[in-house]
Amino acid sequence: LHQAGTDGINISLDTMDPEKYRKITGENCVEKVKRALICCADKEQFQVKINCVLLDQEWEELSELIELTRTHRISVRFIEQMPIGHGTVEQSWTEERIKEQLKAEGKTLKAVSEKLGNGPAYYIQIKGYKGTIGFISAMSHKFCDKCNRVRLTADGFLKPCLQYGKGTDLLKLLRTKASDEEIRREIEDCIYKKPHSHHMEDRKSGGIETENMAEIGG
């Protein structure tokens, strides 16, 4: 991977509980995944990030992920679930609750001043640990004013905001043989119309996206 030019690896890992991992992924290989990410993290060429969506995990599951940062240069990032598609279940964990739990266990937390990537994650580090803990808290700590993302779905639809179903059908433009200049203008127009903020906390705000994240894509 390094010879091919790869210098960063992101791994989606919501739990290291073997049975829960199998239910989520359909595969019984969580130990293999753990060995692989530790192998990458122990090589200075790679920056390894674990993305964990906060669902209904037990604290022990989150703590097990956090413990990886004790001896390895790994960033464990906790992502608050957004009410999109099936993601409407009330989550039990938030950024503040995780930090409170760590402090209750006697851990000293400090903010990480170093810029890690270009995304919205906010990072902290436990005193004495090698790795970091990141939070992408779209619900409890909005970062819409810093959002620099649009998404292109598998069926060619450009979305300026995850919450809303509005956007631009680029696939239709391609199929109608629109010129490169016309497509460029449509993309620019879509970006300029990017909403100032999401309102996912208000289920009555209207225009809520009904597709699942797996359909929208990353």
Model segments located where?
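Radical SAM/AdoMet-radical enzyme domain recognition
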Residues: 1-79
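Auxiliary Fe-S-binding modules of radical SAM enzymes
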Residues: 71, 81-84, 88-218
